[in-house]
A protein has these predicted regions:
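Conserved C-terminal helix/tail region of periplasmic/extracytoplasmic solute-binding proteins
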Residues: 342-417
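A ligand-binding cleft/hinge motif common to bilobed small-molecule-binding domains
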Residues: 109-111, 242-243, 248-265
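Mature extracytoplasmic/periplasmic domains
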Residues: 276, 280, 285-346
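Paired acidic/hydrophobic, glycine-rich loop segments that form the ligand-binding mouth/hinge
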Residues: 99-103, 230-231, 247-252, 267-268
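Periplasmic-binding protein-like
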Residues: 215-224, 262-286
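Extracytoplasmic ligand-binding site segments that recognize negatively charged/polar headgroups
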Residues: 47-62, 83, 97-242
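Early extracytoplasmic/lumenal segment of secretory-pathway proteins
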Residues: 23-111
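Sec-dependent signal peptide cleavage junction
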Residues: 17-27, 401-406
Length: 417
């Protein structure tokens, strides 16, 4: 990595102070400003599709990443959010949209590549990739030849709990099935993450292609719905968990840090059964209408100042070496975000189409209650009621036929006489 580290460290120490303490023009070097100005993006539009609460947006004196990119390039950024990889995929695959930068997770990137929905990147337009991206974030399993992605963040799932509402610190996902916490559990509202918790409990491979395994995991989630009545949420978890009303939530490590900042009664653990380890990465979909602008945005997100501001705001582990090596970084050495030893875990891989369809069907049935004991009882009541109605109908038809046969026989006898 060719850079003057001492200069960069000094710069980052200064930048660890609130960005509002500086004039906007002082944040970036003359060379950086000249680079983005000379790209010729003035008057163009860059459409960015990212997770909610997943970029530094200018609140509380933080850098407004999008506004700074617009200021340096003269381009306009349309920035929109999705709640899950599956929602993002549905929007993208449905057609009629044009996104230039998307930031999905590892297994979804695999799917997009398998379905030929991504464009290869021109890394010559992303010089910060070679300058700053850590070796452990290159050639990742979902893009082994490093053609389509630039790592955005690294994270894990965690079990978040409220110390005031929980008797002792949990060690296992099993507490999410404990009836004493009925109506006090917030669960993932996306199928892949929710199923993973049940799969960990059952000792399954998160990427199993056994339909029997998926059905068993669905049954366990249905039992949870009966016993605990969890609330299924995504971005809503922030307000709900910070309010102090819920005992447990399943979410992501970086987001836990944000919640804990607002409610010091919150804590988290890596459950002993394991966690999902994941990477999110920036990609350019084939529906792009501004690939040059997309690659400029991807490069901008790895400028040392931007990467630091982003990490300081969203609290996820950065792939950027300049951020990782900055000892004044507020998360430097944080055991949740940058653990010395990563917890036991598994990565998600893209699943075969038949398993994806089964997963989606089972998830819909879990949430609707069709797989729960109550739902099955209702189904049995409907079945028996339907059977009774059917039997009554058969008897009625039979009676009419017998009656008609008797009338015909009587008429035939009259005709004889």
């Amino acid at each position: 990595m060719k850079k003057c580290f001492s200069f960069l460290l000094t710069l980052l120490v200064l930048l660890a102070m609130p960005v509002s303490a500086f004039a906007a023009d002082d944040v970036f070097t003359p060379a950086q400003k000249a680079y983005y100005k000379n790209l010729g993006l003035q008057g163009t539009t860059v459409n960015v599709y990212n997770w909610g609460e997943y970029i530094s947006e200018g609140q509380e004196g933080a850098m407004n990443t999008v506004k700074e990119f617009e200021r340096l390039t003269g381009a306009k950024v349309n920035y929109t959010n999705f709640e899950s990889n599956e929602n993002m995929y549905s929007k993208l695959s449905g057609g009629g949209v044009s996104y230039d930068v998307i930031i999905p997770s590892d297994y979804m990137i695999q799917r997009l590549l398998e379905e030929d929905m991504l464009l290869p990147l021109d890394y010559g337009n992303i010089p910060n990739y070679d300058k700053y991206i850590a070796p452990d974030c290159k050639g990742l399993y979902f893009d082994p030849q490093q053609k389509y992605t630039v790592c955005y963040n690294i994270g894990t799932t965690v079990l978040i709990y409220n110390k005031k509402l929980v008797k002792e610190a949990p060690k296992s996902w099993s507490v999410l099935w404990d009836e004493q916490y009925r109506d006090k559990v917030l669960m993932f509202n996306n199928s892949r993450d929710a199923f993973a918790l049940a799969q960990f409990m059952l000792g399954q491979d998160l990427n199993t292609t056994s339909e029997e395994d998926w059905n068993a995991a669905a049954e366990l989630l249905a039992k949870q719905k009966d016993a605990v009545r969890p609330v299924y949420v995504m971005d809503e978890v922030f307000n709900l968990m910070e309010s102090g009303e819920y005992a447990f939530a399943t979410y992501y490590a970086g987001d836990y840090i944000l919640m804990q900042d607002n409610n010091p009664d919150l804590a988290c653990c890596f459950p002993e059964e394991g966690v999902n380890l994941f990477y999110d990465a920036m990609c350019v979909p084939k529906c792009t209408q501004n690939k040059k602008g997309a690659e400029a945005f991807i490069n901008f997100m790895q400028e040392p100042q931007v990467a630091l501001a982003n990490q300081e705001y969203i609290y996820y582990a950065s792939p950027n070496l300049a951020v990782r090596q900055n000892e004044d970084n507020s998360l430097y050495g944080n055991p949740v975000v940058y653990p010395k030893v990563w917890p036991k875990g598994q990565y998600f891989y893209n699943l075969p189409q038949n398993i994806l369809e089964l997963q989606n069907d089972l998830w819909a049935r879990v949430k609707s209650g069709q797989l729960s004991a109550d739902g099955k009882a209702q189904d049995r009541r409907i079945y028996w009621a339907s059977g009774a109605v059917g039997a009554a109908a058969v008897l009625a038809v039979s009676a009419r036929l017998i009656h008609k046969a008797r009338k015909n026989k009587e008429q035939n006898l009259r005709d004889l006489y």
